[in-house]
Curated annotation (Swiss-Prot):
Residues 50-63 have a biased composition (Low complexity). Residues 42-63 are annotated as: Disordered. It comes from the Eukaryota. Present with 1730 molecules/cell in log phase SD medium. This is Uncharacterized protein YLR358C.
């Protein structure tokens, strides 16, 4: 959610500026449908891979997990490319605050227990890093993850302003490879 509007990450239109799909369902309802259908995005049309996030305050008003399939993480290179494409998408669509050319990317791991391979959530969040504990608790509850280990990648300015944060499952690969791929892509 940005300035009170639901965004679609497939077409980047605001709700209200976007035509309903052929079934007459709005972007907001499509987001709910995607979540209810087990996060199985539509193959085309509005609402594909939809999510919402907050750009104000220290806590997200809402976030939506995104599925990471086993085919996406079959190798380090494909996983890094997947992350890079997501970051580039948000750079070009204005999701990241690019007021300064100096960006930092910090990665660290938060462990809440053994990794649950049944569910692989992905969350893109724009906000303050201090809200991460609450966000992770919300994430575990929303995707019915009993215990998980998360890799958190923060992309933002060197000051205390809100940063864009990527949260994904900790996988058996070198986090430095993921970081390097994203940094090269942004530069």
């Amino acid at each position: 959610m940005r300035n009170g509007k639901i965004l679609c990450c497939h077409c980047f239109y605001n709700k209200g500026d976007h035509e309903d799909d052929e079934g007459g369902r709005s972007i907001e309802s499509l987001c709910a449908v995607n979540l209810a259908e087990g996060l199985n995005p539509r193959t085309n049309g509005p609402g594909k891979d939809s999510f919402s996030f907050s750009t104000s305050g220290s806590k997200p008003s809402s976030s939506l997990s995104f599925p990471v399939t086993s085919s996406m993480v079959s190798s380090t290179s494909s996983y890094s490319s997947f992350l890079f494409l997501l970051v580039v998408n948000h750079l070009f669509s204005g999701r990241l605050r690019c007021g300064s050319p100096e960006f930092i990317i910090r990665s660290f791991t938060i462990t809440l227990g053994p990794l649950n391979h049944n569910i692989s959530p992905f969350v893109f969040f724009h906000g303050n890093i201090s809200s991460l504990p609450d966000l992770l608790v919300w994430l575990c509850r929303s995707v019915r993850c009993k215990t998980s280990t998360f890799l958190v990648i923060e992309i933002g300015k060197t000051n205390e302003e809100a940063a864009s944060i990527i949260i994904l499952p900790k996988l058996p690969l070198d986090a430095c490879d993921v970081k390097s791929s994203i940094i090269v892509g942004i530069l």
